[in-house]
Structures are given as structure tokens and as C-alpha cells.
């Protein structure tokens, strides 16, 4: 290997923006050249290649362990050649899991689950690394010089401190999520981000906050193991893509449409249909999944190794903050707080009329025939409406709602605050005449400026 050139100097070559090429030969010396799905940096002396099919390349390596791989810098289009010696195939372990998660995510989005999968991670010794001289015409601009500088270690530490403080000072869960995404945009210039929290009871991720996509998408669900986000959550693996092509954009844009008037349609998840890069960080406390932090961009080179490492630190802060908020909301529900100013209702003659229908079998609520919300948040809203209709009450506490066994909340880590955030956002978006307003820690009111007809089916 060249003494002046190291694999760690070429991180952009391992992002897969420009497909790499491998050349092998069989025992008789007959060559075979093909494209590679993944070239994975292991360390200064080793790389791993994805083995997805028992093809000619695989058979050649069994006969002859020597291979040559060309990788490309997507910014300069400079080519580098790796002379390799095959060492072993790994079918389990950390390396296999990291490479497999990336392939599984693409397979899930493109409908290729069970077909497009990793068979093994083939580990090679890099015996020589060389720059392919004369590959490009002289005089091309230096792309490295044009890359923005982040100001060195002092700026990095100061930025991390700033983001951490924003998260730590948040008074409640919703403020924490908003502050985290705002800080990521202000410091990192991450313009398109979202946070999804894990609902253990439903085994799904629920979108609770987003930035850059407008006001829609809160409440959108992702099944564990589904797509890039669901795969990152299932495997507890960070996923970074620089090659999100048209297939991913097309798959994300497809929505299941309601087949009848009262079918609970999916809420479209916030996302760019033309995203070229993505970085997905599972939010965990130990090995326990709390949620997922997702960022994407139209620039295929937006996210680097540096961003991945740095965002993992930020993700740990967010995960601990979420966990702290959920613990606190379970233990400290009825702290005294000044009441909010009540909303003044308009005269009865001018009030709107709303029809809310609760479908018990689907556990879903519709407003004037339009889907609003389902599952536990729907049960919570229906309980509040029934209680308000029966007693005239509009003020409630988290504690009393949580203690209602009919709601089916889990006894530990019930995510009540996150469910209330989701319900509040869905009402703001779909039913602004009916609102849930915080009146202090552990307290809220049900406010309406419409006459509500309740129908249960």
C-alpha cells in the first residue's frame, strides 16, 4: 500500500455515489468484471464487500482469492485501485449486521424483502492502494478545497455544548423535540429532520416532530422493520445513504388510499420525494428503543462520517431527554401551576356544529366523515368528550386520565405525554374548533367553540 495514501483519506469513496467495480479471475485465469453493491471500510488494512448472490465473482474467489477493486471520489471523479486478497466470509456479527441493515432498508422500500439481501460480508486484506494517474484530464477544480470547513475542534465542541443545552433546558417533551430539531438546523444546517417515538404497545414508530416539511405529517406511523427508518429501529443500526435514487423517492410517494368512506387511511410521513441522501439514528437508552431521529437532503453528499458520528452523540442526548421526560411525566403529574385564561365561546347561535364518530372496532374517530385519529389517542379523546358531556367539565389532569383502566395504557412507560402531543397536533390540523390546551404541568383543558354531536358505532 502506498505510504502516502491511506484508506481513511478516502471516506467519500465508500459512500457508493459512484458504483465501484471488481475484477476477479477463475483458476484458468479467465477474468470477470462486475459492479459492486457495497464497499465497506473496515480499517486501514481491510475492506468488506457485499455478497448477495452466489454468482461468478463468488465462484472465482473460491478458486483464486485475488481481486482488484476500483473506487471513485464522487466530488472529483478521481479513481483509486485496491489490490485485494480474500480472507473470510462473515455471516453474523457487528460487521455483517451493519452491512445487512443498509441492504435490508433498500429492499424494504423497493418491495424486495427476502430477495435483495446480504448473504455474507466478504472481508479482504488491502495489499495495495494506488491512485489511478491520468484518469482525469488536468486542470479540474479541486473539490476538496471547495468543501465548507466547520471550524475545527473548538467549533465542534461548542456546537455540541449548544445543542445539548437546548435539549437539557426543555421544560417538556414537545419543547425538547422542537428545540432539538431547531438546533440541528441552526448549527448543522440540517433543513429536513423528524423525530419518531416508539410505541411499544403497537410496535410502531409515531412521528411527533418534524422540521422543513410544513405542518403536516404529525402522527404518521412507521412499522418496525419497514423502510429505512423502520430498519434502523429494528436493528438499532445507524443508516447513512448517499444514493437514495428514484426508486426510494417513488416508493415514499406511494400512499395507500382509503377503500371506503370510513377506512383509517395512513397519514403521509414527512419526507422529500426527491431525497438523495439520508441519515437515520436510532434513539436508544441501553438497548431499549426510544425512537428514531431522521435527516435527509437533496444533496447526495450532504452527510459525511463526521455528521454520522456527531449526530449519534446528539441522538444519545435526545434519547436520554425523552426518557427523562417520560419518567417525569409519570411521577410528577399534578404540580401546581397558574391556570390559563379560558377561551371565550361565541354565542350559541353562531357556533359551528361538528359530528364526531367513534368506530369501536377500529378504535378510530372521524370528524364530519374525515379521519382524525385512532388507537389510544382516540380512546383518550373520546373519554374526555364523554366526561365533558356528562359533567360539563373541561379541566383535567394527566393522573386521572392515566388511571382510567379502560384506556388500556401500559402500566410502565405509557408514553402518555407523547400521545397527548399527537392528539393535540391532529386536532390543530384537522379540527381546530376542538383543542387540548396545557394549563400547567400535568394539567390540560378541553376547549371548543363548536357544538359537538357524538356518535358511537
Task: List the model feature ranges, each with a label.
Residues 332, 372, 387-389, 409, ...:
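DNA-binding patch around the recognition helix
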Residues 216, 273, 290, 296-313, ...:
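Regulatory loop-to-helix N-cap segments in sensory/regulatory domains
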Residues 339-363, 368, 432-457:
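A short linear beta-strand->loop->alpha-helix hinge motif most characteristic
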Residues 208, 215-271:
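Regulatory sensory and allosteric helical modules in signal-transduction proteins
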Residues 138-174:
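Signal-transmission linkers at sensory-effector interfaces
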Residues 370-404, 423:
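Short amphipathic alpha-helical recognition elements used for nucleic-acid or partner binding
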Residues 266-268, 276-284:
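A short, aliphatic-rich beta-strand micro-motif
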Residues 170-208, 325:
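Helix-loop-beta substructure at the N-terminus of cytosolic sensory domains
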